[in-house]
Amino acid sequence: MARTKVHVRKGDTVLVITGKNAGKKGKVISVIPAKSRVVVEGVNVVKRHTKPTRKMPQGGIVEKEAPIHSSNVMLFCGKCNSPTRVGKKFLEDGEKVRVCKRCGETI
């Protein structure tokens, strides 16, 4: 299976643009490039029934975030305070950075 590129990284603030969680904003917890999915904090929360373990002797029902497809999220720019597409630019020292397509600010 070919590895696909995902337009967001761990730690980015994103806005969910489609689905049952549309309009919610959160921080990316993890990225799964092989499946083009991201896990966003507070978005797509599901309940999982867990058996008692040494780590969690009580067991029971645990709420956790499930992954959503990366095409359903858009990077959120803090400067222009809106969702935006991502562009890439080279600085004078040759470093490659991501920039906001709306305001041109480095992300």
Swiss-Prot record:
GO terms for cellular component: ribonucleoprotein complex; ribosome. It comes from the Bacteria. InterPro entries: KOW, Rib_uL2_dom2, Ribosomal_uL24, Ribosomal_uL24_CS, Ribosomal_uL24_KOW, Translation_prot_SH3-like_sf. This is Large ribosomal subunit protein uL24. GO terms for molecular function: rRNA binding; structural constituent of ribosome. Part of the 50S ribosomal subunit. Belongs to the universal ribosomal protein uL24 family. The keyword rRNA-binding applies. CDD domains: KOW_RPL26 (cd06089). The gene is rplX. GO terms for biological process: translation. One of two assembly initiator proteins, it binds directly to the 5'-end of the 23S rRNA, where it nucleates assembly of the 50S subunit. One of the proteins that surrounds the polypeptide exit tunnel on the outside of the subunit. Keywords: Ribonucleoprotein, Ribosomal protein, RNA-binding, rRNA-binding. The keyword Ribosomal protein applies.
